[in-house]
Amino acid sequence: MEIRMSDSSSKPVLVTCGLPYANGKAHIGHLRTYVPADIFARSLRKEGREVTFVCGSDTHGTPIVVNAEELGITPKELVEIYHKHFDETFKQLGVYFDAFGTTDDPENHNRTLDIVNRLIEKDYVYPKIIEIAYCPACNRFLPDRYVEGACPHCGETARGDECDQGCGKHLEPGELQNPVCTICGGPAEYRHQEHFFFKLSEFGDYLMDYLSNDLGGTTNARNYALGWVKQGLTDWCITRNLEWGVRFPGHEDLVVYVWVDAPIGYIAFTEEWAAQAGDSWEKFWKGEGEIVHFIGGDITYHHCIFWPAMLNGADYSVPTAVVASGMVKIEDKKFSKTRGYVVWVGEDYLDHGFHPDLLRYYLASYTSHTKELNFSWRVLQEKINAELVAVLGNFLYRTMLFAFKNYGEVPEGKLEPEVSAEIEEALKEVKEAMAEYEFKKAVDSAMALASFGNTYFQSHEPWKLIKEDRSACGQVIYNCLHLAKALSLIFEPVLPQTMETAWKGLGQESDIHASRYEEALVPLKAGTKLAKPELLFTKLEDDRIGEMEEIANQRVKAANAKKSAAKGGEKEPSKSEGMGPSEEAKVAEKAAKAEEKVPIETLPQIEYEDFAKLDIRVGKVLFVEPVKKSRKLLRVEVDIGEEKPRQLVAGMASYYTSEELVGKYVVVLANLKPAKLCGVESNGMMLAADDGGAIVAALMPDKEIKPGSRIR
């Protein structure tokens, strides 16, 4: 269950999005955060809430420095290119921020120094001599992505600050095993150097209380963070050996870690907005205003643990809610730029003439915000043709065309109680769904109103009535036009450009984007002139979709060829997306290994009675946390239809993060005798497929089914 948005209309709301990294192009994975956040902000404004919507480009950190060096330009030149790209792309998609800055803006440098100095003054920051990766051949220290090696927790290939290919854990300097320099490919060594640490360990009790009782948003974010806090927190190194970034106070040879100054950008961008609008940034960050962060699920740890601890330590307001999206797949394959499973917003979508609103609709309506979203060109075609064209577009166009041809204006009429009740119910459901960050539910409720409109139009047969009783026909069309007005308002947060066209076609002179939901119940004024309607949505034809599928297939083939070259020892430099050649080769090699044929061992046949002894059920994962002292085990709580959740221990930490499992339906062997693994009792087994070690995939039903359902 998601914790609802506050109903207090008196409090201003700040909505933010996780910052796009200014190191590569916008892809559909980015939009899983930005489009729902824009929908949410638009909807709040329609409810009459005071909303400020800010974001900006994340411009610091080693990936940007590494990529700039490869391209032979400065980091500043690189981030300017991509900052402009993201700004333009968001506007094309109808995502409009009140401020869109960069973390290299003076406001962010100043605010970061203010917060860091405040933490130093309150004794939350201390110096410590630690081991830092150093390359003797390059004669330089190697922070973050300048070094790779084995993750100390799961053994997978990892970067200096994160195990991105394995368990997903944040890594501190010096933790990486068998370090290798990504610049020259040679072995690195560890040398001692003074760095500065934030006393994150002192915030365990505060964070436990905050996450359990105060933080709203989506449960996947809270549960994931609570799992880490329960394990115990370690202090966090907040400095790096780089020239590019925000200087650490009093140390010209150090900058603050990117995950310090990046979230502080939320405050800096609010300051930029306030300076331009003549308003106050303190009402959010020092006052009672609400702060809602929309993020990708992969940065939950930073936003629910590091960030609120820093803010609390520096006496700033903490987030009211964190809304974490589910992951994105492409054509049922795990999203991977290296393997070609990616959809670029510009070259794959906008540049081919697809309307921005169609993609916004897909992202909002495909599934619940916290669940995994699969992008498929065929599914896009099906949804647009069956829903936007056949239902919403059909009702709006046939209503407006009939009214324009036969009346030219809004005819005389009264809003019927049945129609009014349907609109009121839709508004109620949409508002409730938005408050719970359930965008699919909101869209489904709005589409149900469009379906009602089609039924109303069809059942009253105005094409016959116009010949028999023009006045009675006018009454029907008046109500249809009123439904069209209501639908335009309700769908505006999701389809802003298309609904603006419909709004103007209805002769409405006000700004639909500034109009409130409540206007959906204000009677249309008879005599209002109607414009000749435009066809709002057109079918996506097979040949057009086939063309896009072929482009996608060619990309995967090219990636496979590159992967084969990498496996054969040829290293092709990567000039985009922040992935160095060493990393790209390793990821490609791992992907190739996963696709190799695995010999299948055939087991002896058994009688049906043997199979019948197995109590195999469908379970819903409620909670997941890593098992202490283990790199591979997860403690999982599963609802299998019993009075209390069943506790299992699953060896999946190397293949799934906690947030990827929570909410999923899985297959459980329920009558396996209890066993203790690393001191934790497991009362059953979560079933999975294993291809020999490279890939483990949990068995999951292809549709939701009641927990406890038997598998026979």
Swiss-Prot record:
Listed CDD domains: Anticodon_Ia_Met (cd07957), MetRS_core (cd00814), tRNA_bind_EcMetRS_like (cd02800)
GO biological process: methionyl-tRNA aminoacylation
Keyword terms of this UniProt record: Aminoacyl-tRNA synthetase, ATP-binding, Cytoplasm, Ligase, Metal-binding, Nucleotide-binding, Protein biosynthesis, RNA-binding, tRNA-binding, Zinc
Gene3D superfamilies: HUPs, Isoleucyl-tRNA Synthetase, Domain 1, Methionyl-tRNA synthetase, Zn-domain, Nucleic acid-binding proteins
Residues noted as binding ATP in the record, renumbered to the chain: K337
Cellular compartment(s): Cytoplasm
Pfam families: Anticodon_3 (PF19303), tRNA-synt_1g (PF09334), tRNA_bind (PF01588)
Enzyme class: ligase
Record's function text: Is required not only for elongation of protein synthesis but also for the initiation of all mRNA translation through initiator tRNA(fMet) aminoacylation.
Family, per entry: Belongs to the class-I aminoacyl-tRNA synthetase family. MetG type 1 subfamily.
HAMAP family the record matches: Met_tRNA_synth_type1
Name this polypeptide is given: Methionine--tRNA ligase
Native organism taxonomy: Archaea, Methanobacteriati, Methanobacteriota, Stenosarchaea group, Methanomicrobia
Gene behind the chain: metG
